[in-house]
Every structure is written in structure tokens, then in C-alpha cells.
């Protein structure tokens, strides 16, 4: 069986299942496609014990030259189905989900600014093909949805029989997950499916399920104080224990800090910054977190260790608590340490 035959069979199986089971919700469609398309290592860790074996597409990129290095690395990938594994130059994090989400967040922001504000029809067309690959990967691998695309551009991407050169090359990139298998005989079934797209064209149902397109134009709500407190669930010790008392004391200070951030009184820090520090993402992915973000507590032994730390692969924010040797600093000092941590954009903060 050829690679092309395998892809065609995969598309047919997904199509039949979606149609036969009347799955119309865009999020449910995306979840089903992710399950059946992405291969290799698990996209997310469900616990610290989750094995990290399995095939990946490994890329190494520079935060300071992200467009150039990412386009080189992603452009060289031939099979886009395996889980993407990202390493930033000079940083020591092992990617089990966190660095990948961080990569998608950063690269989509730069793509938006450089290529879509406004669209640059005279840019290198191969750039738009690589952009299409990145958009498809981001959607299928728990990254951000590309919600910066103009509504008319989304319609052209799905439906136009005479697209612009920019859209034509975006299609090529988006279609690369399915070897550009579009418009062939398997796309006919009771006139229900007019266009099958992988991510946005070769597998996801676009023309006959226009509600799917709203994923591209629906803006994520701004995170609120209530939303942040609800999302970052504290993991306390047993009630009545000395440790629980210390944890509650620190958590109370942290919620005060969240109020300061929410009110705009901590310069350059937002609630999104804190979520990003804990998870690698500045908003909840469209398919949700495999493991909900949580706050854990660890005993502090030195002054510097009152800095928060995180494990973005399991979405864990750790807040130090006082020990017998070291009492809790003042709120002013703690808030300053929290600022230092949450303003950090590099993996490997010590």
C-alpha cells in the first residue's frame, strides 16, 4: 500500500465516521481528526510519569530569529503527522508539550505581524506554503487557532476556484498533511461534503459545515481574575496540617498578587503571562488542557527559592512556602519575585 493510498484510506475513514455519526461541532471535528491524524509521542502528558517515547518531528529554533529558523526547520519536514518536538536555542527544556505550545504562540504572532498586517502579495510564495504547514500543525497539535485571518480570506481559502497566489500557496501548505489530495473522487457523498481539508482544507469540513470557519474568526475572551483563579487550581495538603496552613498563607498572598495583575498595577505582567508561565500557552487551547493547570507548593530553604517555578508539560505552577529556617518575605518582596518569574520568557530559569 502506497503512502498516498494510506492517506486516502485515512481521509475516507474520517469522512465516513463524521458523516455517519452526524458530528457537526467544529471542536468535536477537530478533536476526532487530531486523534486519527497525529502519530508518535503523546501530545500532552497526563502526569509526570507519562512516557516520553514515540516518534517526533524534532526542530530547533531561535527565539530571536524565529521566522527564519522556524521556516527552515518546518519547511524541511516531509511527514507532518508525528508530534512536533521543539527546542529553543540554548534552552534546556525537554518538550513534552509546553515548549511546543510556546512555539506555536510565538510563531503565529510573528506570522500575523509580518505576513497578514497587511497581506504581503509580493513576499516569497514558498513562505506562504510553509505558513500553511505551520497553521495546520498548530491547529492539530494543541497550538493556537489562527484567528487573525480575515473572514474574506477564510472564505477564499475554503471555496474559491480561482484563488490568489497567496491563498494558493497557503492551500499547498495546509494540504501537505494529506499529500495535497483534494478534489478527487472520494470527496463525493450525497453532496454533503463539498470540500475536505486537513486542518482547514483537506480533512476538516469547510463548505458544507460553515460553522467550522468560525474557529478562525472567534476571538478568545480576555482572561478575568475569576477565570485565572478558577483555572489555576491549588493542590493543598491535608486540612489541619501545619503544611496546609503555610500553603493557605502563600496562596492568599498569590491571590492578592493576581488582583494586582488584573488591575494593571504590575508593569508588563498580565494574567495571560501567568498562564503562559505555567502552561506555555497564553490561553486555553480550543480542545482544552489534557491536564488542568494546578498550583503546587514546595518548602523554601533560601531567599531566592521563593521564585515560582513551573513544569509547562504538566501545567504545574509551584509556589514556595516558608520553612523552619526561612519565614515568608513581605508581600512587596514576594510580588517583586513573582514579577521576575512571570516576565521570564525562557525555559530554564533558575
Show the residue positions of the predicted features.
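C-terminal catalytic/scaffold cores in eukaryotic proteins
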Residues: 45-58, 62-71, 80-82, 154-350
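Hydrophobic, conserved cores of late-appearing folded domains
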Residues: 3-141, 145-151, 267, 350
Amino acid at each position: 500500500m502506497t503512502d498516498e493510498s494510506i492517506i486516502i484510506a485515512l481521509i475516507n475513514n474520517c469522512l465516513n465516521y463524521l458523516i455517519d455519526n452526524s458530528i457537526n461541532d467544529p471542536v468535536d471535528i477537530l478533536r476526532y481528526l487530531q486523534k486519527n491524524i497525529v502519530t508518535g509521542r503523546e501530545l500532552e502528558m497526563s502526569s509526570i510519569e507519562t512516557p516520553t517515547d514515540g516518534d517526533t518531528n524534532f526542530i530547533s529554533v531561535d527565539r530571536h530569529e524565529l521566522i527564519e529558523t522556524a521556516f527552515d526547520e518546518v519547511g524541511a519536514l516531509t511527514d507532518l503527522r508525528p508530534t512536533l518536538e521543539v527546542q529553543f536555542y540554548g534552552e534546556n527544556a525537554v518538550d513534552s508539550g509546553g515548549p511546543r505550545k510556546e512555539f506555536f504562540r510565538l510563531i503565529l504572532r510573528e506570522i500575523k505581524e509580518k505576513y497578514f498586517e497587511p497581506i504581503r502579495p509580493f513576499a516569497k510564495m514558498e513562505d506562504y506554503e510553509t505558513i500553511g504547514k505551520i497553521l495546520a500543525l498548530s491547529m492539530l497539535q494543541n497550538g493556537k487557532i489562527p484567528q487573525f485571518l480575515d473572514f474574506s480570506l477564510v472564505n477564499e481559502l475554503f471555496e474559491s476556484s480561482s484563488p490568489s497566489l497567496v491563498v494558493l500557496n497557503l492551500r499547498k501548505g495546509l494540504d501537505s498533511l494529506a499529500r495535497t489530495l483534494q478534489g478527487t473522487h472520494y470527496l463525493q457523498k450525497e453532496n454533503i461534503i463539498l470540500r475536505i481539508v486537513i486542518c482547514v482544507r483537506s480533512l476538516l469540513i469547510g463548505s458544507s459545515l460553515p460553522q467550522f470557519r468560525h474557529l478562525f474568526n472567534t476571538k478568545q475572551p480576555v482572561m478575568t481574575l475569576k477565570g485565572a483563579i478558577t483555572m489555576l487550581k491549588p493542590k493543598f495538603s491535608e486540612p489541619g496540617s501545619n503544611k496546609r496552613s503555610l500553603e493557605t498563607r502563600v496562596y492568599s498572598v498569590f491571590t492578592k498578587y493576581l488582583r494586582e495583575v488584573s488591575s494593571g498595577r504590575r508593569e508588563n505582567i498580565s494574567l495571560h503571562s501567568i498562564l503562559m508561565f505555567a502552561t506555555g500557552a497564553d490561553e486555553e487551547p480550543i480542545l482544552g488542557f489534557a491536564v488542568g493547570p494546578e498550583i503546587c507548593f514546595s518548602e523554601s530553604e533560601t531567599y531566592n527559592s521563593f521564585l515560582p517555578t513551573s513544569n509547562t508539560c504538566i501545567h504545574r505552577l509551584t509556589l514556595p512556602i516558608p520553612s523552619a529556617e526561612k519565614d515568608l518575605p513581605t508581600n512587596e518582596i514576594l510580588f517583586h519575585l513573582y514579577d521576575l518569574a512571570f516576565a521570564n520568557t525562557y525555559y530554564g530559569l533558575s
